[in-house]
Regions:
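C-terminal regulatory/oligomerization modules of transcriptional regulators
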Residues: 1, 51, 55, 125, ...
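Alpha-helical linker/hinge and terminal dimerization helices associated
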Residues: 16, 20, 104-119, 134-145
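N-terminal leader segment of winged-helix/HTH proteins
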Residues: 1-38
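Membrane-interacting alpha-helical segments
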Residues: 2-7, 89-94, 147-150
Length: 150
């Protein structure tokens, strides 16, 4: 650990993201799941009710900046694994899907508590505000690049 703060930029933010993601992916691998499956399952589990498949796919593609075809394939895999269920175009998590989401959440919650231990709440709050602003600006830039490419 260092007390000298590195300059904040894409590399520093990316290193933190990929370190955290690697932890999550290790936990997920123990349960035979992937990162994209977990994000898709999270969207279904935390929804107020069943989601239209298109809305679920849109939510996940928006979060991950991934292709819709990839997310449709992920939904298909979760359906085949019995972690999601379909009623027509409506998708909902199964009990097994909720259980996997809860188990992974509990495991990663313990790890996250260790990762964030000892960091003053005001520093975490400031970091959250900065990252929210960076995300907002990056999403605006991505939208502009997408418009320009059309």
């Amino acid at each position: 650990m260092t007390d000298t703060a590195p300059p904040v930029g894409g590399r520093t933010i990316g290193l933190a993201h990929y370190a955290g993601r690697a932890v999550l992916e290790r936990v997920l691998a123990r349960h035979g799941a992937t990162f994209q499956q977990q994000i898709t399952l999270r969207a279904a589990v935390t929804a107020d009710g069943p989601l239209e498949r298109g809305a679920l796919v849109e939510q996940v593609t928006g979060a991950l900046k991934s292709e819709a075809a990839d997310v449709h394939a992920t939904v298909d895999g979760l359906l085949a694994a019995g972690l999601l269920a379909a009623d027509g175009s409506l998708i909902r998590p199964t009990d097994a899907g909720r259980e996997l989401f809860a188990v992974v959440g509990a495991e990663t919650g313990e790890i996250s508590a260790r990762i964030y231990a000892g960091i003053p709440p005001e520093e975490l709050a400031a970091t959250g505000r900065v990252l929210a602003r960076v995300t907002e600006r990056a999403e605006a830039e991505l939208a502009e690049l997408t418009r320009a490419a059309r």
